[in-house]
Amino acid sequence: MMTETFINETYGINGITRISLKKIIKVFSFPNEINIKFSNKKKSIDIKFIYDGLEVYYMLYFFSENIEKPEYQTLYFDVKYIHLNDDSIKIGDEIKTVIPKIKKYLKRNKKNINFEYDEDKYTGRYLFDNKNIDIFFEKCRNKKIVDGIMISLPYEDILPENKDILNEIEDIIEIKNKIDNFFWK
């Protein structure tokens, strides 16, 4: 059964407005699969939660001069289907039906309806809401068909006063250190 997703009036989906893996698990339950990847130079940790119809991508970036201290984090949702108030969009929809729905959603929530657009011979994308809504399409004959929907949360700097974020990151760093010790020491 596909995971139900609803876009928030502010940022994110299903009431998730800040970056928190614990909140994601609380809202969507434990994922079907978890992938963890470390960059070759150990400057980032990428975690992917896989659900039916939803993938969550979390990235934690480190200062290049201090590999132990995280600098900022990002998170985005890759959805197959999402509700926009009284409308919805899904992979496989024609882009000409999706754009008016997104603009209606943005207008209703008093957001800027301007967008960025990029296209090549085979694919393209629309970026709305300060790049927090990203719609990818592929060209099939004379149609542009949606083949990706990503909803981003604004990136967050890792600041000492954000105790909840720091506690969650400490858990992630602990896992990273255990893996480092297992393979590299």
What is each of the regions a protein language model found here?
Residues M1-K185:
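Short helix/turn-capping signatures at newly exposed starts of structured segments
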